[in-house]
Amino acid sequence: MQYWDDVLFQPFIATIRGEIYGVITQDELEEECFNLARRAIAAFKFPKISTDYETFYAIREEDTLVEVDESTEGAIPHGYFINDLGYKELEVLIAWMKVYWVEQLLSNADNFEDIYTDSNIKTYSRANAVDKNTKLMDQYRTYARDLETRYSRVNASRGASIGDINNE
């Protein structure tokens, strides 16, 4: 079993930039990463290894997770892959997680709200911030598609292959 906390969340968090991840709690971060991972798995076309997963709920006690029932107060969803995925599959999933992270950033108007309203204080342009993040999302989406295209054209022995689906 590969727990998402280990194989997806840590590499994802290491590659993104954003102040929000410095001010939210560990539980909020894990819940957000869980939702991004589910979207990334759904977006991954034709993985050669099944990306089926199981969900469980846990609460944090000091530095460990304790599995609990879904209805328990403070329970955070976590996931693990039933099959062991390779680096290539994980790389594609992390790339899609980045796309959905920027998309989520853009969809929240609070991220672009002016903090100051005084006419004497110069602040950044909200339009420029939105434009910059839109371009970033397009770059991440192009990168994710390129990774997925390269992934689908090479088999496990690194030979050229088109159409090998779940046969390894």
Show which residues each predicted segment covers.
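Conserved short "hinge" loops at termini or chain/domain junctions
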Residues: M1-L85, D146-E168
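Interface-prone segments of viral and bacterial extracellular assemblies
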Residues: T64-E70, L90, D110-D114, K132
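Eukaryote-specific, cytoplasm-facing alpha-helical/coiled-coil scaffolding segments in long proteins
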Residues: S119-V130
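Glycine-rich, aromatic-bearing surface loops/beta-hairpins
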Residues: K132-D146, Y151
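Elongated alpha-helical scaffolds
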Residues: Y87-L106
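Short, solvent-exposed secondary-structure capping/transition elements
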Residues: I49, Y53, V102-D114
